[in-house]
Every structure is written in structure tokens, then in C-alpha cells.
Amino acid sequence: MLKFSNVARRRVPVVLVAMLLGACLIRPSGALAGTSTLDGIYTGAQAERGLTIYTDHCEMCHAPNFTGNPGAPPLTGLEFLFNWDGMSMAALLDYVKTMMPPGEVGSLSDQEYVDVVATVLQANGFPAEDSAELPTDPDALAGLAFQRPK
């Protein structure tokens, strides 16, 4: 069994706290500023790209104003917000990629799907971030929460 001196025992918690605080302060270049839709997890430019894709592939069912049509649910408003509240952005993107567009599932690139999701976030009034785009990486998206405004 390892034995630690009293000095070593006192230093371990201090070192651990310092490491945790340091990890919280570090933001690698290109890292997302926030961890939820309320923090700004996409850029305005990304939403603009997504709007073009939405117009070409989505609005015929979901309407130009994102309000939906019979058989195609709204992508804005309380129903949409409550449906996804508390879910990860990975879950939302996975749903979009595996279900949309009907008859053409998987026809868009990962970046195009993410850009459309950014457009939907913008249409719901979620804030944009200045420089860090919503990522295509599923692991990164899993750490981002869809959180409705309270």
C-alpha cells in the first residue's frame, strides 16, 4: 500500500482544484463559446448558407416561414421548442439526417445538414456566435444542449 506524507495529502486537493479551474478557463481556438442553444452555438454566416439549402430542400413541406404544413411539423414555435428541449444537438442533427428530406434521406452533406439546423435555430430566435460554427462532429454536438428560452 502506498503511503503519502501529510504534505502530499494536503497538496493533492489543491492541485486538483487548480487543474479544474484551469480547464474551465481554457478555450481552444475555434472552440464553441457556449454549451447550449441559448449561448450562441452557430454563426450568422452558417445560418445564411443553411437558408439557401432550406429553400431548396425543406420549405416545400415546412413552409417558407418554418410554420409547417399538414404532415410536416413546424420548425419554430412552442411545439418545436418543447419537443427538443433538453435534448442534445447530436440528437436533433441525427433526426434530421436520418429522416429528411423525405424521399431523399442522406442527400445532403454533413455540413449542409448542420447549416440547415443553424437556420432553424436562427428562425427560433436563438443567438448566433461570432466565429465558432455549429460543428459537424457528432461527439462535439453531443456536448451541446438544445435549451428553449424560459
Language-model segments: which ranges?
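The canonical Cys-X-X-Cys-His
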Residues: 50, 54-65, 116, 120
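Short linear capping/connector segments at secondary-structure termini
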Residues: 35-36, 74-80, 136-139
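Bacterial N-terminal signal peptides
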Residues: 14-27
